[in-house]
Amino acid sequence: MAKITPKTLLKKSSKVIDLDDVDISKYDFSIDDLDNEKSKNHALLKKILDSSSACQVSDAFSSVSGRSGVIDGLKPMNDNKVYGKIFTAKTNTDDWGTSLMAMDNAEKGEVLFIYTYGKPASVWGELASTCAGEKGIAGTVLYGWARDMDALVDLDYPVFALDYLPNAGKALGLGEINVDLEIDDDIIKPGDFVFGDQNGVVVIPNELFHETMVATFNVKVKESHIIKELKKGRLLSEIIGLNR
């Protein structure tokens, strides 16, 4: 693994787009703009999200709602980033067939969000990931366990999970799809927005998508200005006005 230094962090953080000339007030973002290339919002929305991190999206959502949007415990199973509209599923860990039902019913570009309960067992792995990727599913977020890590780490298909283990149940198909999910104090609905990367997973309610995207834009503009000042040698505490 490459050594991370302050210089490389700055270089990594500088993966920002020049948004200074964009009048964000002219845009009315909808989650449907993500897959609608004819929408006037599509290009800018993709630019913002492609260059954003879960940290920035969470900060933005916090400024809008007072909540982080983070689903605790979820972590990436590979280096792939994902964002998109959620298609939900709920199943006992004895049944990985429900994951296939969700995959079969989800639309291209959607992200599967699968909630599992029961004893530790996997409901997602290499075969499901390969099939989902071929169908055009954007990725899988699994509130449960994945498996086949030797394959998942090399697949160009995003998978997020609580952890991984080798055992699995059976293809029963007895769970539910396209239903509301409750995780701790969070209600995740079909059609909500999810964003996941190496930092974790953030869920944004559909009704707050526009406000959160505008706030994400503003976070990115602010951070790009801060990075420019840091490269001039200024202290971060000075830039943000921290009392000393």
Predicted region positions:
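Small beta-barrel nucleic-acid-binding modules, primarily SNase/OB-fold domains
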Residues: 19-25, 29, 113, 124, ...
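Intrinsically disordered, low-complexity regions enriched in acidic/Ser/Thr/Pro/Gln residues
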Residues: 2-91, 224, 228-236, 241
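Structural motif
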Residues: 68, 85-88, 110-113, 137-141, ...
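A glycine-rich, hydrophobic loop/mini-helix early in the fold
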Residues: 74-129
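Acidic, glycine-rich flexible loop/linker segments
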Residues: 162-239
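Extended, positively charged loop/linker patches that create polyanion-binding surfaces
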Residues: 118-181
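Generic structural signal for well-ordered, non-membrane alpha-helical segments
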Residues: 50-58, 121, 125, 205, ...
